């Protein structure tokens, strides 16, 4: 019987450089999304207080 040699891929450990790059990219992406969310909330708050100052809206319930 001829030898049953099958080419198996050699399993290597995780690449530290690859892990650092992937972690950095994911961290920056998540941070960017968080900053965009924060800026959007700031814009909404600023618009609310601008309308409140102009008298276009009120926080007092009218009877």
Swiss-Prot record:
One of its GO terms (cellular component) is mitochondrial inner membrane. InterPro entries: COX5C. It is found in: Mitochondrion inner membrane. It comes from the Eukaryota. Its main location: mitochondrion. The chain crosses the membrane at residues 15-34. Belongs to the cytochrome c oxidase subunit 5C family. This is Cytochrome c oxidase subunit 5C-1. The lineage of its organism: Eukaryota, Viridiplantae, Streptophyta, Embryophyta, Tracheophyta.
């Amino acid at each position: 019987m001829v030898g049953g040699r099958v080419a198996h891929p050699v399993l290597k450990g995780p690449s530290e450089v690859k892990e650092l790059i992937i972690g950095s990219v994911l961290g920056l992406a998540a941070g960017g999304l968080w900053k965009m969310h924060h800026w959007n909330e700031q814009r909404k708050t600023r618009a609310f207080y601008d309308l409140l100052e102009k008298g276009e809206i009120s926080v007092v319930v009218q009877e």
